[in-house]
Amino acid sequence: MANIRIIKRRIRSVRNIAKITRAMEMIAASKMKKAQERGLAGRPYSEKITEVIAALAALPQSGEILHPLLERRPVKKIAVLHITPDRGQCGGLVANINRKTGTFMLEQKIPVSAVVVGRKGVDFIRRIKQQMRAEFINLGDRPGYLDTLPISRVIMDDFMSGEIDQVFIAYTQFVTTAVQKPVLEQLLPVVPLELPPGQNLEYIYEPESATVLNSLLPRFVEMSVYHAILESIASEQSARMVAMRNATDNAKELIGELTLVYNKARQESITNELLDIVGGAAALA
């Protein structure tokens, strides 16, 4: 009888957990839809400004002074902008992006530091004992463009002052609801567009290309950081929704298994009671 009570208590406990994970799944689904819309809406602009900047950087600057964000110099120190969630419960997303950044940082033979977005990233960088230049947490589920400007400002200031010679950005790219891809790519200096031999650029710039480039470069860095954060948020909410759905399904499966065990134990208990009654009646006869 004690075993039946324990099993019944376990079924009730798992059922309560299933209710919680189901509620979390629904919340994540709602946030995911909004995050996906924002991330996908900004993707065409981000891709186009990247293309224009890379094309401009490939043009000869006619003796103009090179913009500091384009300056290539011997790499003596590297920085990584590491973008992660503030919270967990999103499957393997946090572990995957942390592994990507951690492997890269630990492989470097020169000093490397991190500018970290998200509490999970902050904890990870501290755990692997790497230098952290700055940390930004609690940006929320819907950060605005202005909210991310201090992040890009830290990166640009360090690069232009010569403290950092190369900047990489690590974030989780949203592919589909079920697929999120950890990405690590160079942000600074801007990589010029490599054109096939004989191919000409089709852009006509007014004013001249150098003026446009100098004006757009800071915006490009700011937009790249902002878009990477939006992609990471969309990936986080998608991964969390899938993780909570899997948790709910697993809870339902466990409830089914426990119910079967409970029914067998109850049937065995009833059979034993009947045998005791029959045995007692036979003894009295």
UniProtKB/Swiss-Prot annotation:
Subunit structure: F-type ATPases have 2 components, CF(1) - the catalytic core - and CF(0) - the membrane proton channel. CF(1) has five subunits: alpha(3), beta(3), gamma(1), delta(1), epsilon(1). CF(0) has three main subunits: a, b and c.
Location(s), subcellular: Cell membrane
Protein name: ATP synthase gamma chain
Family annotation (PANTHER family): ATP SYNTHASE GAMMA CHAIN, ATP SYNTHASE SUBUNIT GAMMA, MITOCHONDRIAL
GO molecular function, one term: ATP binding
Topology of the protein relative to the lipid bilayer: Peripheral membrane protein
UniProt keyword annotations, A-Z: ATP synthesis, Cell membrane, CF(1), Hydrogen ion transport, Ion transport, Membrane, Transport
HAMAP family documented for this protein: ATP_synth_gamma_bact (MF_00815)
The protein's role, per its UniProt record: Produces ATP from ADP in the presence of a proton gradient across the membrane. The gamma chain is believed to be important in regulating ATPase activity and the flow of protons through the CF(0) complex.
Any one of the GO BP annotations: proton motive force-driven plasma membrane ATP synthesis
Intrachain S-S bonds: none
